[in-house]
Amino acid sequence: MKPVFKTSDLAIDKTGSVLVTEQLQKLIDLAAQNQGIALVEKGTYLTASLFLKSHMELRLEEGAELLGTTDESCYPVIPTRAAGIEMDWYPGIVNINNQTDVTVSGKGTINGQGEYWWNKYWGTDQTGGYRKEYDAKGLRWACDYDCRRVRNLVVMESDHITLKDFTSTRSGFWNVHVCYSSHVHVDGIHITACGSNSPSPDGSDIDSCE
């Protein structure tokens, strides 16, 4: 039986009022070192980007919510691929990059707090934000790339990945992005964009995979 490492083991704040990225990453690293399960228990966990490792499972208990912070300074800018272009951009809230044998499961939720990112793109009334500035310059095509937003879950250059049962909602950009990967099993995940003011809240984007 795989060892289980719980958020309560590390006394990680679950009120959603304190940023707990470092503590959650420590839990993930501990699970990976032991080829075990990082169990996020019921509660709300305010976080920036988390990076999963090979031979582990991230399990979101029912009632558990990973709540993406809207403080952009908390997100690193890394080489990635967004909307078909290689560029430096924000990673996801949950990331599986260059890993193998990783599972994300459970009845919990990844919540991107999309309203912040949507308003960044085109304001509260779809006539402002980056879009207004870029439209005025005749650069509509570039707005999607220059207006960095956060995806909820990114799988990049990885293999033998399972995504099962969790909910992805209110993503700042695409909800689930699987890119340059193989043997990815997606089963029973629930995706909601929420809101007519949400630009590019695609559900699941399978990009250059086999």
Feature-to-residue mapping (PLM):
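Extracellular/periplasmic carbohydrate-active domains that bind, remodel
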Residues: M1-E210
